Amino acid sequence: MVPESPTVAHLSQVIHDVTAPAFLLGALAGFISLLMARMNRVIDRSQALNAIGDNDDVKGHLKSDIPRLKRRAALLNWAIFFSTISAIVASFLVIVSFASAYLSLQHEYVVGFLFILSIGFFVTSLLSLALETRIALHEFDHFGGK
């Protein structure tokens, strides 16, 4: 038994309804790109500091920054993880919206819950980025940068 095909008006309404999650997906893609760039910078700095010899009296003090870089990398890793989960949930939200329209199912509560869940993961990711940024700025002050 094939369900009744949705009307053009109904599909148009579904497309309208998934506009916010689609914009959220675009924002998350850009945000994950930003997080990856920050992570690459932290990794590059860690590799440079690890390359400093233990007997280097001139640059040896810079190695004290390695634990801070590890903490930043961990926070960025969590931010990337939560952003990715947010994007997956937002994608699932779009799928549920269209599948529900095709199958003529009520989906308002599920879609609302998925949107709240996706935004919650995004906020968690933003909080991880805020903590990482705070550590990065503290690090800058610690080494006398102005």
Predicted regions mapped to residue ranges:
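Cytosol-facing regions at membranes
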Residues: 1-146
